[in-house]
Amino acid sequence: MTVHVALGTDIIHAHPQASGQNLGKVSYHDFRLFCSMAGELDGGGVFLNIGSAVILPEVFLKAVSVVRNLGNRLEEFTTANLDFIQHYRPTQNVLKRPTQNSGQAIALTGHHEIMIPLLAAALKASLEASDARPRGARLNRSSKQ
């Protein structure tokens, strides 16, 4: 988990003991960590933006740009935006721009309290199904048994 603080956006920033220096320092550390994780999406990774309409879509697009501008390959991954209303920034910065040359983008519109448990159940079922097959086993798609 990473935290990307937008100074002045949370009530705690007005507290006399809040340290802009410390918040900035750990946010920068987390951005670098996030860039490293974004680089691991290449070749089949999945990035989910769940309910963030402004900050995370911007951070994600910048992380993708950092990875690519450093000369690293970042293609063939999937992005998904889950929200009850599709907004401009997630559509552009999560779905369209990062995957425009390769990859897949999925927009799921609905209530989080319904979609997230359904997504978790689907992932769990998929993992259980893959664990049921012996390692190295392939599905036999021919009609011969």
Model-based region annotation:
Residues 3-6, 21-39:
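A general structural motif
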Residues 19-22, 51, 107:
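Conserved short-loop catalytic and cofactor-binding motifs
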Residues 33-36, 43-46, 53-144:
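C-terminal functional extensions of proteins
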Residues 4-14:
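Active-site rim beta-loop-alpha module in soluble metabolic enzymes
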Residues 1-3, 142-143:
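Short intrinsically disordered, low-complexity coil segments enriched in acidic
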Residues 2-6, 47-51:
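Short, conserved beta-strand edge motifs with alternating hydrophobic and charged residues
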Residues 12-18, 61-62:
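Glycine-rich phosphate/pyrophosphate-binding loop at beta-loop-alpha junctions
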